Amino acid sequence: MGLIVYYSSATGNTEYFVSQLDQRLFKIDKKKPSMLVDEPYVLVVPTYADGEGKMAVPKAVIRFLNEDENRKLIRGVIGGGNRNFGRYYSLASKIIAEKCFVPCLYRFELRGTEEDIICVKKGLERFWKQLV
């Protein structure tokens, strides 16, 4: 079982989603985002974006990933979002995947569905086995 690092907003959608995954969790603290992880992880992140797609990645996540050790250990990203935002849906995960050269493993809407949870659990199990 791998480590899930996540950031959740006041809505709690991302936190709810990751709590259903039966994985070890590490929450990026908005007030202390420079905390370090010491093992490979998958990042789960919501999208914050204005109407033009700007500022999609939460600032705390940017600060967390600006730490070299944290950036070296990211192995994949899962994105949360809201389809009402069209092309900006789950934009943060796409940006992070591109900048960190890791795969975007999955995208879910709002709190995710039971089907999303099942897919992500199975996908993470396969993903972590491939990395070993």
UniProtKB/Swiss-Prot annotation:
GO biological process: protein modification process
Family annotation (InterPro entries): Flavoprotein-like_sf (IPR029039), RNR_Ib_NrdI_bac (IPR020852), RNR_NrdI (IPR004465)
GO MF term list: FMN binding
Alphabetical list of Pfam families matching this protein: Flavodoxin_NdrI
Function: Probably involved in ribonucleotide reductase function.
HAMAP family referenced in this protein's UniProt entry, alphabetically: NrdI (MF_00128)
Family: Belongs to the NrdI family.
NCBIfam families xrefs: nrdI
PANTHER family assigned to the protein according to its UniProt record, in alphabetical order: PROTEIN NRDI
Protein's UniProt name: Protein NrdI
Provenance organism: Bartonella henselae (strain ATCC 49882 / DSM 28221 / CCUG 30454 / Houston 1) (Rochalimaea henselae)
Gene: nrdI
